[in-house]
């Protein structure tokens, strides 16, 4: 999955969860300051991303993810780590 594909999915999740037009969701948009998310919204966003990308985001990491791009970077890094682990286990 490419960074652009992850960005598209994250933007879709945020748009759906927060009721914000996708055109308003830039990579640097802050969930709270720019998109109006509260703490419950943030929890729901993390849960939706965990489900969509089949990964677990620990609370400590979730607290550090405050923008769309940070979410994309975390997911991209986590997916790379999983892929590398799967490759090494299969060899």
From Swiss-Prot:
It holds the Pfam family PP-binding. GO terms for cellular component: chloroplast; cytosol; membrane. Keywords: Chloroplast, Fatty acid biosynthesis, Fatty acid metabolism, Lipid biosynthesis, Lipid metabolism, Phosphopantetheine, Phosphoprotein, Plastid. One of its GO terms (biological process) is lipid A biosynthetic process. GO terms for molecular function: acyl binding; acyl carrier activity. It is found in: Plastid, Chloroplast. The modification O-(pantetheine 4'-phosphoryl)serine is found at residue 39. 4'-phosphopantetheine is transferred from CoA to a specific serine of apo-ACP by AcpS. This modification is essential for activity because fatty acids are bound in thioester linkage to the sulfhydryl of the prosthetic group. PROSITE patterns: CARRIER (PS50075). Pathway: Lipid metabolism; fatty acid biosynthesis. Residues 4-79 form the Carrier domain. PANTHER family: ACYL CARRIER PROTEIN, CARRIER DOMAIN-CONTAINING PROTEIN. HAMAP family: Acyl_carrier. Carrier of the growing fatty acid chain in fatty acid biosynthesis. This is Acyl carrier protein. It comes from Cyanidioschyzon merolae (strain NIES-3377 / 10D) (Unicellular red alga).
